[in-house]
């Protein structure tokens, strides 16, 4: 079984690598993370998730044979669901989280996860209900302000998103990711103030976060080539490098998308997913952004086909 698991992961990695190399030609760059002949990816180790896989087996055994209270069983379902989520097995994660909720209907953390899954399925009303329930159960659940803010952001209710993103930022002003989402929202809500606010908020950021360097890039203080160099220096191991690249490609993609470079943004979103950091916000919403871009790309393809048809007829 061990040999089979290793070979399967290796084959998936090779397939993904080939697909990503094809994307490089879609992104025009003078250098840095992506060029026509070069794509920066983290090294993939087939054993990266071995500990999570072992823990899932152990939790499954306990759930099958263990005698416990509903509260204990709900906790185990939640733990296994979070592990499944970290492996990108979102269907299995959702099943476990639903089981946990059936046993313990007042688990705020479960509603937070389920709300996120509903958001990623574009069930915005269902997601909003779930996030509101989190606050009813636990008013101090900080990260739900981010998730509910994202829900508002993606339906264009930027004034409501601003309230949640601002509250999320005020809870930790040293966190650059809170600053980045405020900036992205303000580009839609009040673009004339977004850059000025980013400059001001950047002053209080911690250098302990990789995202601080992304903010410096957004401000124009460093080039994409310098950003790449800092990324390789910042990462202490291949897993951290994968996380850094996931974040970086996502925010580079958002920058491209905001200036109308849809094809380049799509390629960068795919690269954000290539490092397989499934439980990062940036991975989840890279997949979400790609899903939202499909109708746009489909309409473009229809127009091209229509133009070709007219050319043939006339």
Swiss-Prot record:
Signal peptide: 1-25
Subunit architecture: Homodimer.
Keyword Nucleotide-binding: no
Compartments where located: Cell membrane
Record's bilayer topology term: Lipid-anchor
Main localization, broad class: membrane
Keywords: Cell cycle, Cell division, Cell membrane, Lipoprotein, Membrane, Palmitate, Repeat, Signal, TPR repeat
Lipid-modified residues, S-diacylglycerol cysteine kind: 26
Lipidation feature positions (N-palmitoyl cysteine): 26
Source organism: Haemophilus influenzae (strain ATCC 51907 / DSM 11121 / KW20 / Rd)
Domain of life: Bacteria
Keyword check for Membrane: yes
Function text: May be involved in cell division.
TPR repeat coordinates: 74-107, 108-141, 246-279
The name this protein goes by in its record: Lipoprotein NlpI homolog
Any GO CC annotation of this UniProt entry: plasma membrane
UniProt-listed GO biological process terms: cell division; receptor-mediated virion attachment to host cell
């Amino acid at each position: 079984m061990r040999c089979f698991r290793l070979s399967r992961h290796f084959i998936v990695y090779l397939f993904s690598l080939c697909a990503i190399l094809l994307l490089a030609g879609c992104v025009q760059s003078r250098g840095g993370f992506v060029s026509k002949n070069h794509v920066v990816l983290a090294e993939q180790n087939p054993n990266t998730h071995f500990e999570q896989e072992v823990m899932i087996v152990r939790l499954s055994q306990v759930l099958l044979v263990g005698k416990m209270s509903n509260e204990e069983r709900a906790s185990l379902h939640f733990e296994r669901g979070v592990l499944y989520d970290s492996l990108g097995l979102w269907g299995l994660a959702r099943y476990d989280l639903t089981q946990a909720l059936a046993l313990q209907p007042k688990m705020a953390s479960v509603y937070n996860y389920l709300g996120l899954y509903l958001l990623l399925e574009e069930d915005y009303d269902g997601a909003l209900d779930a996030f509101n329930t989190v606050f009813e159960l636990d008013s101090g659940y900080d990260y739900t302000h981010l998730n509910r803010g994202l829900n508002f952001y993606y339906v264009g209710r930027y004034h409501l998103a601003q309230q949640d993103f601002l509250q999320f930022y005020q809870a930790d002003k040293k966190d650059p990711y809170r600053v980045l989402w405020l900036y992205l929202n303000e580009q839609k809500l009040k673009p004339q103030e977004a850059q000025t606010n980013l400059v001001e908020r950047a002053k209080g950021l911690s250098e302990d976060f990789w995202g601080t360097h992304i903010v410096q890039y957004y401000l124009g203080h460093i080039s994409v080539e310098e950003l790449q160099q800092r990324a390789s220096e910042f990462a202490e191991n291949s897993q951290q490098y994968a996380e850094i690249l996931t974040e970086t490609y996502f925010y580079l993609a958002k920058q491209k998308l905001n200036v109308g470079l849809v094809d380049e943004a799509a390629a960068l979103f795919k690269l954000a997913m290539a490092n397989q950091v499934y439980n990062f916000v940036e991975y989840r919403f890279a997949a979400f952004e790609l899903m939202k871009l499909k109708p746009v790309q489909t309409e473009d393809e229809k127009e091209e086909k229509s133009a070709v048809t007219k050319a043939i007829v006339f």
